[in-house]
Amino acid sequence: MLNNIKTIFTSKLFYILVALIFIVPFLYEKLPIRIDITQQSSLPQKIWLTYSDLAVESEYILFIPPKTKYTLDSNIEYLKKISCNEDDLLVVDENRDYFCNDKYIGTASKYDGNKNLIENFVFSGIIPKNKYFVTGTHPLSHDSKYFGFIDKSQILRKAKPFF
């Protein structure tokens, strides 16, 4: 039995497998195009093609949200739809309804999933340069209606629905 364990630990194959276990995830993060799976319920699609080239035309982005009292874990990546771009007119009314260039894009809930009152992001005006307003399709989607604009520097990858 001990000889079998020694044989395993002295095998080149063992060290190659260990190296692959540690190297593959690192390399996967760096791929220019990859498949990502989201567990969030804020968008109907679950499987996405993501691109490291931020010049790729896409209306979806993978990003790290700004740190607020509603985003406690700063390592969680969000995938949302860009609903309003820089230089667009964003308006929120007294009913917590959001409009981009006069087109309705969503309503902020008064309560979170635990029935606690939740503050919404209030802004009316032209979206500043390099800022984006992102949303999900779920009524309780945790998005820009609560944490505000996403800065271009927070974008990790562009995304397109795979299915």
Regions flagged by a language model, labelled:
Residues M1-L79, D93, I126-I127, K145-F163:
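Protein maturation boundaries and topogenic segments
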Residues T7-Y15, K103-D112:
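Short charge-dense sequence patches
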Residues Y60-L62, L90, Y132-F133, P139:
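Generic structural signal for buried aliphatic residues
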